[in-house]
């Protein structure tokens, strides 16, 4: 469906947040939503991020289409693809409930320069971490 980024991350793994997160939003034919959250922490430069930043919108709310042949989201995924799974809500209005979340346990590296560019254009565009409210969080592979 779409993907977007938040700075800082809107998720915590073992009470630790990440510098950024990429949300890969999926929707099935019944309209049900699932989001894969890829945590991003300072490290090596990420080649996919370089491509995406070239097409990054400069104003909040703008939508940009990147040529499909340039976009291989596998380049964003960490080697270890184990994840936590829970039912939650979208993190942007209207914050709809009933969303299946899969938060990857291992962060993907992003260069400090890549992080700095995003954070200058979109400072603190993250929703505060929400309480679990009794939601079951399970570890999956």
Where are these regions (language model features)?
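Extracellular or lumenal secretory-pathway regions
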Residues: 1-19, 23-141
């Amino acid at each position: 469906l779409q993907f977007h980024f938040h700075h800082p991350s809107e998720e915590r793994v073992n009470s630790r947040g990440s510098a950024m997160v990429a949300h890969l939003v999926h929707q099935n034919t019944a309209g049900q939503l699932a989001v894969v959250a890829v945590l991003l922490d300072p490290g090596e430069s990420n080649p996919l991020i370089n491509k995406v930043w070239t097409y990054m919108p400069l104003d909040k709310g703008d939508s940009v289409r990147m040529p499909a042949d340039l976009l291989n989201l596998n380049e964003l995924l960490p080697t270890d693809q184990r994840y936590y799974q829970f039912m939650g809500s979208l993190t942007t209005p209207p914050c709809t409930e009933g969303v299946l979340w899969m938060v990857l346990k291992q962060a993907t590296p992003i260069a400090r320069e890549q992080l700095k560019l995003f954070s200058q254009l979109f400072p603190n565009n993250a929703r505060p971490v929400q309480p679990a409210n009794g939601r079951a969080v399970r570890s999956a592979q």
